[in-house]
């Protein structure tokens, strides 16, 4: 088998509709757009969400919630990802050096997901109860 001998299965691809090629084709003259009107013009059509002047659904529904500014600079780290960090001490800079979080992250929390085999010391990071138990069970410790 060679790449130049490959072809799609029979019936898998249909030919593109050729419009404006005579009345016998079924899509001649108006090309399936009907007569006149906004949608028949080139570039014609209404924007997404426009409902013909009726108050759109997006505006009929009430506003709710907000976007937390702290969420933009916070990250969650899984226990299993700690294996990628070189060294025994894990802090925010160690996570950044291991490319586990981006440079703009200011807060990180370690959550229990996966396992950890080697003892590590976690400094200055928040840790969930389950993650704390797993780290201490592996012989590690948490320092605030």
From Swiss-Prot:
Pfam families: Ribosomal_L27A. GO terms for molecular function: rRNA binding; structural constituent of ribosome. InterPro entries: Ribosomal_uL15, Ribosomal_uL15/eL18, Ribosomal_uL15/eL18_sf, Ribosomal_uL15_bac-type, Ribosomal_uL15_CS. Residues 21-31 have a biased composition (Gly residues). The keyword ATP-binding does not apply. Residues 1-49 are annotated as: Disordered. GO terms for biological process: translation. It comes from the Bacteria. Keywords: Ribonucleoprotein, Ribosomal protein, RNA-binding, rRNA-binding. GO terms for cellular component: cytosolic large ribosomal subunit. Belongs to the universal ribosomal protein uL15 family. Binds to the 23S rRNA. Part of the 50S ribosomal subunit. PANTHER family: 50S RIBOSOMAL PROTEIN L15, LARGE RIBOSOMAL SUBUNIT PROTEIN UL15M. This is Large ribosomal subunit protein uL15.
């Amino acid at each position: 088998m060679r790449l130049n001998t490959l072809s799609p299965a029979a019936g898998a691809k249909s030919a593109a509709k050729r419009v404006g090629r005579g009345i016998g084709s079924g899509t001649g003259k108006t090309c399936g757009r009907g007569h006149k009107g906004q949608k028949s013009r080139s570039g014609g059509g209404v924007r997404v969400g426009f409902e013909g002047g009726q108050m759109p659904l997006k505006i009929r529904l009430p506003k709710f919630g907000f976007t937390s500014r702290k969420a933009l600079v916070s990250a969650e780290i899984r226990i299993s990802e700690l294996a990628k960090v070189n060294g025994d001490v894990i802090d925010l800079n160690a996570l950044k050096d291991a490319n586990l979080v981006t440079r703009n992250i200011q807060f990180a929390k370690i959550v229990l997901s996966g396992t950890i085999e080697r003892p590590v010391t976690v400094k200055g990071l928040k840790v969930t109860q389950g993650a704390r138990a797993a780290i201490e069970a592996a012989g590690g410790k948490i320092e605030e």
